[in-house]
């Protein structure tokens, strides 16, 4: 193993994306079932440096770096942290992406760092490695104009690997989204105008995502808002915050929300929204399940004929809500199922759970064709060449179940009644309770506030002492001199 000074010298002269302390592989992943001997071997792995630009570098380090005159190291591992429900660990939300990008831009523009290499480093925790790489990749896509593939290739140089992201369900996971899925989602969201960091309202996002402040997020600004289900009255019950319809009405009216779609059992009277001037629709299906085809088509039909924004909720506003909004994203923006899930989770962590993920994968091709036909129809080409393929695909899809097996009864499921959702704790209840119990974490900015106040107070005292002990007596002496003349 080379010494730190030798490693820095070697890094400074090495070609881009290959700056390692030696030829061994630093990107080997730790398994959760690793033996102590394997862990000891992995701890001896060498550091990895990946050049992003001539001044920006991403590093995976197996020991904390020391400062240098020509390098500035920083880490966000303990600053921008994902708030998990169960075993989920990412991706980080849109506010954290914004904070990270602002941090990078500030460092690159800092006068005191103009001659320094900016090195974002992460440690040995695989989950934090994945989230750190996610942030770096997002910066490359958003600010450096890289394609998702280019950003991903930069990060997986050599044998470097990152664990994929999983859902917020309790227990095992059978579906994952990758960094590349996330980068594609961010790229398409940029292209379609889903976010713009030049006008992004960080305070609003971080305020309203909290359970106590309404627990809602925009998925598509001015079009789709996902929120947790309102109750008959506002209170703290069973460990989570409950909000009445009246809690949301002022914000909805100020942001042109015209339609409410409820996917869960009736916890409030819809008249409280309709009397306030909103349209309200009920499309019930069981918590944690996937919607029937009739539910999907009715949801899409409502959304395609609504003027203004649409607020969608189930119990927690995560599973059922994310699933149907995901269907809309696939039909009208031709996002893949994985990209739709990735974008939903970047906007609203925890969205789309369990079998709902495979459901979206199954629906992808048919919804793409529906979207193609929809756009063709709008252009006055109702009898165009896509019609035949579209009709054939729908007839084929009707013969398949979620698992790809033949549908034996060929019958549409009965419409779901809210009586089917029992009064006991369901998945949505548990997720809401977990979110409500989260303790607010101090970010890097609030942590500096006490220091700023203390510094300001000390400066004030020092100035007052200088004025009173030196300047003021001098002025009084001069004034006395003028009086004696």
UniProtKB/Swiss-Prot annotation:
Entry annotation: catalytic residues: 314
EC number: 3.1.3.16, 3.1.3.48
Annotated Tyrosine-protein phosphatase domain residues: 215-374
Listed Pfam families: DSPn, Tc-R-P
Keywords: DNA damage, DNA repair, Hydrolase, Nucleus, Protein phosphatase
Intervals of motif Nucleolar localization signal: 1-54
The protein's name: Dual specificity protein phosphatase CDC14B
Origin species: Mus musculus (Mouse)
Gene: Cdc14b
